[in-house]
């Protein structure tokens, strides 16, 4: 399969935030809502769920290699990751609909990505008892990464300067809603739905091999240690950043002159962005928003 030509994909202007069922969204993720809501999941589907910029592409690529790295190696060089792991709610003019891509995936299982908060996930995933891999990233690094992503992605609302963006982040006025509700929603769901693996970005950076082994265990895969090691090497940040099939450089809505899609992939980069005052304010808001949850994050490793 050839790399798709999306050169005709044009966006007139950046989208506005809209309130959608109590969550901040843009039309690019709600215009196809009937089909998203009624999407028919299968029991062997694997839903990769994250708040934006928390490691979605990383886990998508790991899963793709675990399942199809050996049997379909040509996929790795001929198809961008966003064609192999459809973004379910995506609805951009000039791009295939996420639901259509998922419906026509030739693979089994079907790895499918979403940024939807837990309450908006199509109910068929829960009814079919599909496996869900959730990746969470500490709020400070997530905010920094999301800011740079919004700067370079014309499909996102205008972020303004760093301080403006940070205030919006603390208020939950970002696409896909508040970070706090997102990470807590899936954490709570995990208590009643056993087929969720809740992963942390920081753990993946600290020991990728260990987390790949955890994934294999959750998915019931008997991947050899040699194979896991090969995959772990192949998914290192700098390798993926140079890989056209994983770095999103084939999508024209992203302006790499402003910032690359894969920027640093580090833990603790927030220290290079937060002022002392911003950090104090953020910690105060965080304490309030996270006071009723048991989920714990690391802001450095």
Curated annotation (Swiss-Prot):
Keyword field: Catecholamine metabolism, Cytoplasm, Lipid metabolism, Steroid metabolism, Transferase
Pfam families documented for this protein: Sulfotransfer_1
Protein name: Cytosolic sulfotransferase 2
Recorded coiled-coil stretches: none
Activity regulation text: Inhibited by Co(2+), Zn(2+), Cd(2+) and Pb(2+) ions. Inactivated by Hg(2+) and Cu(2+) ions.
Record localization: Cytoplasm
GO molecular function, one term: estrone sulfotransferase activity
Active site (UniProt): 115
Organism lineage: Eukaryota, Metazoa, Chordata, Craniata, Vertebrata
Example of a GO biological process term: estrogen metabolic process
Record note on pH: Optimum pH is 4.75 and 10.5. These two pH optima may correspond to two distinct conformational states of the enzyme.
């Amino acid at each position: 399969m050839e790399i798709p030509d999306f050169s005709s994909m044009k966006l007139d202007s950046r989208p506005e935030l809209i309130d959608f069922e109590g969550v901040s969204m843009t039309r690019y993720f709600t215009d196809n809502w009937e089909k998203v809501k009624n999407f028919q999941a299968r029991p062997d589907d694997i839903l990769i769920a994250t708040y934006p910029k928390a490691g979605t592409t990383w886990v998508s690529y790991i899963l793709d290699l675990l399942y199809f790295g050996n049997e379909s190696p040509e996929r790795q060089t001929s198809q961008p990751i966003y064609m192999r792991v459809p973004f379910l709610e995506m609805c951009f003019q000039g791009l295939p609909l996420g639901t259509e891509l998922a419906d026509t995936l030739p693979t089994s299982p079907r790895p499918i990505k979403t940024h939807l908060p837990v309450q908006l996930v199509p109910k068929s995933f829960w009814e079919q008892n599909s496996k869900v891999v959730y990746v969470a990233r500490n709020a400070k690094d997530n905010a920094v990464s999301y800011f740079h992503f919004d700067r370079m992605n014309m499909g996102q609302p205008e972020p303004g300067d760093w301080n403006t963006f940070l205030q919006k982040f603390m208020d939950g006025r970002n696409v896909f809603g508040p970070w706090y509700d997102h990470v807590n929603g899936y954490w709570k769901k995990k208590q009643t739905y056993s087929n969720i693996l809740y992963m942390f970005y920081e753990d993946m950076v600290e020991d990728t091999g260990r987390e790949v082994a955890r994934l294999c265990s959750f998915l019931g895969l008997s991947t050899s240690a040699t194979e896991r090691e090969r995959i772990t090497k192949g998914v290192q940040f700098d390798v993926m950043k140079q890989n056209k099939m994983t770095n999103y450089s084939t999508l024209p809505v992203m302006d790499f002159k402003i910032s690359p899609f894969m920027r640093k992939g580090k833990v603790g980069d927030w220290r290079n962005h937060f002022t002392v005052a911003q950090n104090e304010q953020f910690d105060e808001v965080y304490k309030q928003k996270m006071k009723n949850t048991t989920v714990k994050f690391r802001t450095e490793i």
